[in-house]
């Protein structure tokens, strides 16, 4: 929780950035707070729509909250972002997660 507190203080001091929001989202996800993770990860991708790692984690957090349609959208946008940066591994991982979500 110390990392979360430090990151929240940075955010409160006006140091908002995609990396800070991704870091907060990641820490909240690790702490089991998917709802707070989603909040920060959505901010991360708003600040940097090409941030494929944030899209991937956002998709996972949304899926964890059973918000499957939103997770599909996050993975789809994340795949496009990853492919735009030539990040084939991230695109491949998100394609696998998307395929799992689409299973009946």
Stretches with model-predicted labels:
Residues 13, 47, 64, 81-85:
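Structural marker of alpha-solenoid helical repeat scaffolds
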